Amino acid sequence: MIRVVEKGSDVALPFSRGILTRSITSVGIDVDLAYSIAIEVQEELTRKGKSIVTKDEIRKLTYQKLVEKGFKEEAKRYLFWRRFRKMKVPLLILLGGPTGVGKSTIATELAFRLGIRSVIGTDSIREVLRKVITPELLPTIHTSTFLAWKEIKGTTSGSPIIAGFESQVSAVAVGVNAIIERAKREGLNAIIEGIHVVPGFVDVKGEMTFMYMIVARSREDLEARFYERTRYSKRSANYYISHLDEIMEIQRYLIERARKFGVPVIENIELEKTIRAIMEDIMERTIEAMKKKGLDMLEEPK
């Protein structure tokens, strides 16, 4: 049996093809190919008579296998993410976007690939607030974001739909910011997703804090997503489609806010492309940040 140790540690764990496969798939390699590479790595270590190996040795061998198979970009990404995780730098990813655009699915997939255990939806925060704040005190949190405008009393300047939306967001953002503060204070990795992740309302300060605005390419795309969503939800697609005008107005508002605050806007057309765009953006920005500290995250293993 091959056992794996971290340099400078006495703890040895059994080599796991499953764990290595997940590491390889995190950079966009198909799971079947990733598993075959993991087997090749294990077989080569066995052939060399290795019973104890370091994680660095596994990283180096895996990197070489990816390069040999022509996956140079994937090898670079693999090298980066292994080194990033080894540094134990807390990572905070914030995903905003309109109702039904696929934020939860993206968050779950990102969490799997990056080994992040904490995924928090802002709808859960809103639900907690509904239990402690009465409708009489704050009516806009007791309805959907695209219907909150109906609870606004008196006249508003500008769009009533956006006024209602902002009213709900400003309340939920208090809880979102509290979670962000705790994650930063305790050095936790987390992904926070939801329509209430709005630039200007949510704190994005911090070197390893990344916000993205996920949007639909078109009204038709979003409508199709609502029909798909009903396969896993009790709520009818018609509920959302009957309010598509309001939802699209909120999307336009979110795009404007994102551009104003320099937050990347990503059209969620294909899940894999969206995941790759987010991970590559995090990688590129982190590489630049680490360069300023004199660290080369892409130095080839020796």
UniProtKB/Swiss-Prot annotation:
It holds the Pfam family ATP-cone. The keyword Metal-binding does not apply. Residues 2-89 form the ATP-cone domain. Pathway: Thermoadapter biosynthesis; cyclic 2,3-diphosphoglycerate biosynthesis; cyclic 2,3-diphosphoglycerate from 2-phospho-D-glycerate: step 1/2. Its cofactor is a divalent metal cation. Keywords: ATP-binding, Kinase, Nucleotide-binding, Transferase. It catalyses: (2R)-2-phosphoglycerate + ATP = (2R)-2,3-bisphosphoglycerate + ADP + H(+). Coiled coil: none annotated. It is an enzyme of class 2 (transferase). InterPro entries: 2PKG, ATP-cone_dom, P-loop_NTPase. One of its GO terms (molecular function) is kinase activity. It comes from the Archaea. Its EC number is 2.7.2.16. Belongs to the 2-phosphoglycerate kinase family. Catalyzes the phosphorylation of 2-phosphoglycerate to 2,3-diphosphoglycerate. Involved in the biosynthesis of cyclic 2,3-bisphosphoglycerate, a thermoprotectant. This is 2-phosphoglycerate kinase. The lineage of its organism: Archaea, Methanobacteriati, Methanobacteriota, Thermococci, Thermococcales. The gene is pgk2.
